[in-house]
Amino acid sequence: MEQEVIFNGQILTLTRFWATGEPCLWITDPEQIGMPKMEFVGGHPDEYCIFLKNLTETELAQITSLDGAPLDVKEKRNDI
């Protein structure tokens, strides 16, 4: 299941990386490729994501739903 979320003021898609199944935040706008911890992960120019395993506990706590409600990303990782 994919979910649109807010992280660092940007709307990203909380999903699983297609190649490994790892939870990640996928870009929704090409301008997001410059965000800290964003990685190029594919053969297409728009395949960038931030792997949740690379975020600190503080950064994980900053991921919210589109209405600003905090998300328990640790719990959500199993549902994505």
Which residues does each PLM region occupy?
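Residue-level detector of beta-strand face positions
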Residues: 2-4, 26
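Acidic, low-complexity, intrinsically disordered interaction modules
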Residues: 15-66
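Short intrinsically disordered terminal tails
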Residues: 1-2, 73-80
